[in-house]
């Protein structure tokens, strides 16, 4: 869905809001693509947080190198 949204989105500060309105109003099923993208991203982060919780529960934080790599990947995902 991100590729379809990127085809119509402009990141310029003056036109960003109007490009989102254009996606929702003028693109065929643009509102659906935007909602699917938002829900998919939310589901991805829920899965990531569950994975972190699983690691905490099973004591994986004791493996320092693995845990630090996971934290770096989490921060990169959030950027």
Curated annotation (Swiss-Prot):
Keywords: Electron transport, Heme, Iron, Membrane, Metal-binding, Mitochondrion, Mitochondrion inner membrane, Respiratory chain, Transmembrane, Transmembrane helix, Transport, Ubiquinone. Binds 2 heme b groups non-covalently. Its cofactor is heme b. Its main location: mitochondrion. GO terms for biological process: mitochondrial electron transport, ubiquinol to cytochrome c. The chain crosses the membrane at residues 1-7, 31-52, 67-79. GO terms for molecular function: metal ion binding; ubiquinol-cytochrome-c reductase activity. Heme b b566 binds at residue 51. Component of the ubiquinol-cytochrome c reductase complex (complex III or cytochrome b-c1 complex) that is part of the mitochondrial respiratory chain. The b-c1 complex mediates electron transfer from ubiquinol to cytochrome c. Contributes to the generation of a proton gradient across the mitochondrial membrane that is then used for ATP synthesis. Belongs to the cytochrome b family. The cytochrome bc1 complex contains 3 respiratory subunits (MT-CYB, CYC1 and UQCRFS1), 2 core proteins (UQCRC1 and UQCRC2) and probably 6 low-molecular weight proteins. This is Cytochrome b. It comes from Julidochromis regani. The lineage of its organism: Eukaryota, Metazoa, Chordata, Craniata, Vertebrata. The gene is mt-cyb.
């Amino acid at each position: 869905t991100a590729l379809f949204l990127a085809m119509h989105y402009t990141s310029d500060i003056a036109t960003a809001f109007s490009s989102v309105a254009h996606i929702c109003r003028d693109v065929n099923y643009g509102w659906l693509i935007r909602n699917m993208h938002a829900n998919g991203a939310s589901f991805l982060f829920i899965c990531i947080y569950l994975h972190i919780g699983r690691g905490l529960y099973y004591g994986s934080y004791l493996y320092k190198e693995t845990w630090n790599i996971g934290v770096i990947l989490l921060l990169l995902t959030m950027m």
